[in-house]
Swiss-Prot record:
PROSITE patterns documented for this protein: AA_TRNA_LIGASE_II
Biological-process GO terms, alphabetical: prolyl-tRNA aminoacylation
Annotated function: Catalyzes the attachment of proline to tRNA(Pro) in a two-step reaction: proline is first activated by ATP to form Pro-AMP and then transferred to the acceptor end of tRNA(Pro). As ProRS can inadvertently accommodate and process non-cognate amino acids such as alanine and cysteine, to avoid such errors it has two additional distinct editing activities against alanine. One activity is designated as 'pretransfer' editing and involves the tRNA(Pro)-independent hydrolysis of activated Ala-AMP.
GO molecular function term, any single one: aminoacyl-tRNA deacylase activity
SUPFAM superfamilies (alphabetical): Class II aaRS ABD-related (SSF52954), Class II aaRS and biotin synthetases (SSF55681), YbaK/ProRS associated domain (SSF55826)
An example Gene Ontology CC term for this record: cytosol
Protein name: Proline--tRNA ligase
Length: 570
């Protein structure tokens, strides 16, 4: 393809609105243009990459016998009311009405739509298992869209759904798609990790995320530096084994802590480490109050608390409300004496491993010293409620936790019967009885994947696209378009390369060589072939993007040389 005929509006200056490299270079290199906040047009080069990503996804999904479909973008609101998500999804959901005052939403996901079709059409276990998928636009009204395609209001997504008659069918489908996702992300050249994740608003229990490693990522990943463990910070755990405290229990006594408002204040006044002060955080979980007791040197993990309670809503209680019930302000709250206040008590599992804690007394200015869980508290539940710390021992006992940032590019869920039980998704099983269809759902954010690849594939000059997704294989540049020998050789090389299966972008523009080279570096095609001063000798200059060295190559050997060079590249 001739560069003079393709729309590539490159820019020299860094756009003011762009903060991360992927956004900066995609604007400068003419890959995307903003239409509105969080809404972008994919220009020809970006569209070519999107098409290649989608092709790889289709190959791997078809390999596991998944069926491609296409669902509507506009969905009747009653489907989401039927599942209950219409009332819980929040303000990210675009809503509209037609001229007959009927409610619709612009789909942020498609679980309900797929469930509706399967529920209507499949009534016997004999028609299952089944995996369906689509590549479709999605819409979310992000409060603050940012970083280009990484957080937009409209985006491209591949979403898949498995339907099974039993748990084994779900497990098998989950494993198949998990393996397919790994092949997809390997093929596009990503540095990524599969991590334990929270299901969030999708429903279900078991889930995993695929995270592209990137300093600009919004998610924090905790992983073992010498094992396979990896988890989103929301779900990350530390190594734990229950043990008997190694010190004798002392008598529970009240001690003064005047003017102490924080754990640090208490520790300074009492001359003890913050770890030995067990703090109490009070939450409103749906329709009940919950007190969570954790060591003072840790932060509470609200996702873990919410999942433990199986709560739909969780928020920290207001101090005024807490004072009415506890009789004390934040900083003086504790678990002793709460059993008569109709408050559910959760205690982090690490509290039981040590003796003689300091805890709030529910009287301002006083704490209890020598609190021992098994002696001083009844009617409590234990679990892991801590936000893991970097450097702590990995839960598998192999190495220590290291934190890094990532961009979520894929998510897989075992939904179970979360949707089918509410939306009439029943079949007659092998025993002739009705049972709910068991679902899984599996997503890849394609436009976000494009940005993640871009974040990992650049240098100060521009992009260095992995060969599997690069818009072209070869950037063929004519140094002087007024030189007949160079022009003719360029045409012959272009013809030969295309016949050999290469995708070639021919820079035939009447621009200075410096402009052409700068644009070539910015666009980031894997290999550059320059037809210049040695054209009469049938010799061209070959350079791989991201490498400093160049090679003078005879046109007789060019195809073989380029094939070898491409094989060397990522």
């Amino acid at each position: 393809m001739k560069q003079s005929k393709i729309f590539i509006p490159t820019e020299k200056e860094v756009p003011a609105e762009a903060q991360v490299k992927s956004h900066i270079f995609m604007l400068r290199a003419g890959f995307i243009r903003q239409v509105a906040g969080g809404i972008y047009a994919y220009l020809p080069l970006a569209n070519r990459i999107i098409n290649k990503i989608e092709s790889i996804i289709r190959e791997e999904m078809n390999r596991i016998d998944a069926n491609e479909m296409l669902m509507p973008e506009m969905i009747p609101a009653e489907l989401w009311k039927e599942s209950g998500r219409f009332y819980t999804y929040g303000p990210q959901m675009y809503q509209l009405k037609d001229r007959h005052d009927r409610e619709f939403i612009m789909a942020p996901t498609h679980e309900e739509t797929f469930t509706k079709i399967i529920s209507d059409e499949i009534k016997s276990y004999k028609k299952l298992p089944l995996i369906l998928y689509q590549i479709q636009q999605k819409f979310r009204d992000e409060l603050r869209p940012k970083n280009g395609l990484l957080r937009g209001r409209e985006f491209i997504m591949k979403d898949a759904y498995s339907f099974s008659s039993d748990q084994k069918g779900l497990d098998d489908a989950y494993d198949l798609i998990e393996s397919a996702y790994k092949r997809i992300f390997d093929r596009v050249g990503l540095d990524y990790r599969e991590i334990i994740a929270d299901s969030g608003s999708m429903g279900g229990k078991d889930s995993a995320e695929f995270q592209a490693i990137a300093a600009t990522g919004e998610d924090i990943i905790a992983y073992s530096n010498s094992g396979k463990y990896a988890a989103n910070i929301e779900m990350a755990e530390e190594f734990f084994e229950k043990k008997i405290p190694d010190e004798d229990k002392k008598a529970l006594v009240l001690v003064d802590t005047p003017n102490a408002k924080t754990v640090a204040d208490d520790a300074d006044y009492l001359h003890v480490p913050t770890h030995k002060i067990a703090k109490c955080i009070v939450f409103e979980a749906d329709d009940e109050l919950v007190a969570v007791i954790i060591p003072g040197d840790y932060d509470v993990n609200e996702i873990k608390v919410k999942n433990f309670l199986d709560a739909k809503h969780l928020s920290e209680a207001e101090e005024q409300e807490v004072f009415k019930i506890f009789g004390a302000h934040f900083g003086s709250l504790g678990p002793v004496g709460l059993k008569n206040k109709d408050i559910r008590i959760l205690v982090d599992r690490t509290i039981q491993n040590e003796a003689n804690w300091f805890v709030g007394s529910n009287h301002d200015g006083q704490h209890y010293a020598n609190f021992n869980l098994d002696r001083d508290l009844k009617d409590f539940e234990t679990g892991d409620f801590l936000t893991a710390k970097e450097g702590s021992i990995s839960p598998d006992g192999k190495g220590k936790l290291v934190f890094t940032k990532g961009i979520e590019i894929g998510h897989i869920f075992k939904l179970g019967t979360f949707y089918t039980s509410k939306m009439g998704g029943q079949i007659q099983n092998e025993k002739g009885k009705l049972s709910d269809i068991i679902m899984g759902c599996y997503g890849i954010g394609i436009s976000r994947l494009l940005s993640a690849i871009a974040e990992q594939s650049n240098d100060p000059k521009g992009f260095i696209w992995p060969k599997a997704v690069a818009p072209f294989n070869v950037h063929l540049i004519t140094m002087n378009t007024k030189n007949e020998s160079q022009v003719n050789l360029t045409k012959q090389i272009d013809k030969n390369l295309q016949e050999a299966g290469f995708e070639v972008l021919v820079d035939d523009r009447k621009e200075r060589p410096g402009v052409k080279f700068a644009d070539s570096d910015l666009i980031g095609i894997p290999i550059r072939v320059v037809v210049g001063r040695q054209a009469d000798q049938q010799i061209v200059e070959v350079k791989a993007r991201g490498q400093e060295s160049t090679n003078d190559v005879s046109t007789d050997n060019l195809i073989a040389f380029l094939k070898d060079k491409l094989n060397e590249l990522k």
